[in-house]
């Protein structure tokens, strides 16, 4: 399978959108393109599983590799490939692009321009996950960031210009750290290439990058990617950005874009600078991620805006991804990838339902919402399912991911790590506080105004989006083994290098 198809199809969608003359044609292009991408992602999963059976059990295959020299003086290649981690992230991206298209169709003005930038954002995300050349990854990373300013600043709500600028400046600051770290690895590895696997192979032994050098570039890369993963104290852009973003952008941003942070930390920072993961910096980041988990959950408790509640919840759950990576156990790392997949699905469901309620009610304030289960039962069930998954209720995706993380975390017998794990576990109780408060208040308490009684339940477009995400959240919770197996196949050999 040629992985370039995941870039080519969105490019064709851009062309189709550019030529579209009315909203009907825009809808046709988006539905067709998103459906093709989802179908290709499902096919990729099955093709990967089939190809994986022919590989040795102790190897993490980078399958469907493709390399074309791009800028030879600097040895930059257009290099593509996927392992189990990439495959599940590509599937997650396609699910959210597909459901996001349906979820936001009734809401957004200037649909042609909106979906042009939305599709460009998806190109950056797809390209990042299929790239195995650091420079190509960075290029697609930047492509994913650029549309965010316009999507929030033009189509957002509230303090949208402030939120868009704050998000852009913070993430561009992270990009500056990333390019320094990437160039540092390129020059000090001696491999004369940006390709991740070639660098890892070259530096595994006598040509290892000196530990003192690794300790310089590791924090730059971890913080650079960690900013996108809402690492404390660099998380402040995230709640404002989520709250102001339009529905589909919130879904893709929280569901997928933030996962680029954890993916980059594991794939580049930890994999290529393994000596630095055993020193001072990993303990610093363990403390910061523990703070992220607890601080995000506590902050969600004091919010009244549904989007801010979910945004701070995302800070907590994405902090759990980085926390698991810092635990330095294979089980916890596998849990981190599962958490990326699980959180992506359930937070997309949250933002989809919240956006649909806000579109009609004109408010996201918990204090002015109530009795929605009687008025809009379908959307209310969607919100309840997202809340239960967020709680980690057995049978939903959140339970599988969080249990894997905490079991893996307790495998580290060091007292410092045990204390951090116990503190992080308190977030489970705090999460129950704000989730149950919201579910009880907005779904079952008295309807506060006659305006809410005029709300209508989801349209067919919205039902497709919500039902699809509910099925994915429940499906991953009930049948997690397929994802867990291909993730462990990829995590194991990477950890053999790190440890």
Predicted regions and their residues:
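Transmembrane helix-loop-helix hairpins at membrane boundaries of multipass inner-membrane proteins
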Residues: 1-2, 17-102, 106-116, 192-193, ...
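Short phosphate-coordinating micro-motif centered on Lys-Gly-acidic
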Residues: 142
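Cytoplasmic/organellar membrane-interface segments at the starts of transmembrane helices
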Residues: 376-378, 435-499
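Central hydrophobic cores of alpha-helical transmembrane segments in multi-pass inner-membrane proteins
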Residues: 4-19, 31-46, 90-104, 121-123, ...
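Hydrophobic transmembrane alpha-helices and their helix-loop junctions in integral membrane proteins
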Residues: 99-105, 123-135, 149-441
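Alpha-helical transmembrane segments and their helix-start/interface "positive-inside/aromatic belt" motifs
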Residues: 23-35, 162-174, 376-381, 459-468
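Select subsegments of transmembrane alpha-helices in polytopic membrane proteins
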Residues: 2-3, 252-259, 462-466
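Hydrophobic alpha-helical membrane-insertion segments
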Residues: 32-50, 171-183, 379, 383-391, ...
């Amino acid at each position: 399978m040629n992985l370039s198809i995941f870039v080519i199809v969105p490019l064709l969608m851009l062309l189709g959108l550019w030529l579209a003359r009315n909203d009907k044609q825009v809808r046709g292009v988006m539905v067709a393109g998103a459906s093709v991408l989802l179908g290709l992602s499902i096919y990729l999963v099955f093709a990967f599983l089939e190809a994986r059976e022919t590989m040795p059990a102790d190897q993490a295959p980078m399958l469907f590799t493709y390399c074309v020299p791009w800028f030879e003086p600097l040895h930059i290649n257009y290099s593509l490939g996927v392992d189990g981690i990439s495959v599940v992230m590509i599937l997650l991206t396609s699910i959210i692009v597909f459901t996001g298209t349906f979820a936001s169709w009734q809401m957004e003005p200037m649909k042609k321009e909106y979906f042009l930038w939305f599709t460009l954002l998806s190109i950056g995300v797809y390209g990042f996950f299929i790239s195995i050349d650091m420079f190509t990854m960075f290029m697609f990373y930047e492509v994913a960031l650029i549309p965010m300013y316009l999507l929030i600043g033009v189509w957002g709500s509230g303090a949208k210009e402030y939120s868009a600028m704050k998000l852009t400046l913070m993430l561009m600051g992270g990009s500056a750290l990333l390019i320094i770290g990437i160039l540092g690895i390129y020059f000090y590895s001696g491999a004369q290439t940006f390709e991740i696997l070639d660098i890892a192979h070259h530096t595994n032994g006598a040509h290892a990058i000196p530990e003192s050098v690794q300790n310089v570039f590791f924090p730059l890369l971890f913080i650079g990617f960690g900013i996108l993963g809402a690492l404390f104290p660099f998380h402040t852009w995230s709640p404002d950005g989520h709250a102001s973003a339009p529905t589909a952008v919130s879904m893709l941003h929280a569901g997928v874009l933030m996962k680029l942070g954890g993916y980059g930390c594991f794939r580049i920072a930890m994999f290529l600078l393994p000596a630095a993961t055993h020193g001072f910096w990993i303990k610093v980041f363990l403390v910061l991620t523990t703070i992220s988990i607890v601080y995000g959950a506590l902050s969600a408790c004091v919010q009244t805006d549904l989007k801010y509640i979910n945004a701070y919840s995302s800070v907590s759950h994405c902090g759990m991804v980085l926390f698991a990576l810092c635990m330095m156990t294979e089980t916890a790392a596998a849990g981190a990838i599962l958490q990326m997949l699980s959180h992506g699905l359930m937070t997309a469901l949250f933002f989809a339902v919240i956006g649909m309620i806000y579109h009609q009610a004109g408010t996201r304030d918990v204090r002015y919402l109530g009795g929605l289960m009687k008025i809009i039962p379908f959307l209310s069930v969607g919100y309840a399912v997202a809340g239960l998954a967020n709680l980690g209720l057995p049978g939903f995706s959140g339970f599988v991911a969080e249990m894997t993380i905490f079991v893996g975390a307790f495998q580290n017998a060091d007292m410092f790590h045990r204390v951090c794990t116990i503190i992080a576990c308190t977030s489970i109780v705090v999460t129950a506080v704000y989730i149950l408060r919201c579910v009880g208040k907005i779904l079952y308490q008295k309807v506060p105004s006659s305006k809410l009684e005029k709300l209508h339940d989801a349209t067919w477009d919205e039902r497709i989006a919500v039902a699809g995400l509910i099925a994915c959240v429940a499906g991953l919770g009930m049948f997690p083994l397929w994802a867990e197996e291909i993730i462990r196949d990829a995590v194991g050999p990477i950890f053999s290098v790190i440890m």
